[in-house]
């Protein structure tokens, strides 16, 4: 069995992390397991943090002129995995790329009969999923500690 997370593979990933020709944008979404394995090795972790700091510095100095926003997103994700917290010193970070995946025009769809199906823990269809829903009026002050 091939170990995808061996030292040389992880080192190669760090070598190509900032090169979109070596690791295209489409692969950014699947890098997290590699980042988690980089975090387990002190030398690779140190090297990764250095790469991220360098790119963050370039971004803060010159923005998207010198650093592709996708590289900054990768470094932000890597930083979060390695440090367990977000990098806060970045000026005008690139927008998140996962907010809108695709816009779909549904104006041409007419009389679409869509029904939400819900299943119980045994996989049986629930005919009326809100049948046992109980709504109660609750005083918010009961839950606020004074």
From Swiss-Prot:
Disruption phenotype: Leads to cold-sensitive growth and elongated buds. Is synthetic lethal with a MUD2 deletant. The keyword Protease does not apply. Keywords: Nucleus. This is Nucleolar protein SWM2. One of its GO terms (cellular component) is nucleolus. It is found in: Nucleus, Nucleolus. Present with 1720 molecules/cell in log phase SD medium. The keyword Manganese does not apply. Its main location: nucleus. It comes from the Eukaryota. Belongs to the SWM2 family. GO terms for biological process: 7-methylguanosine cap hypermethylation; tRNA processing.
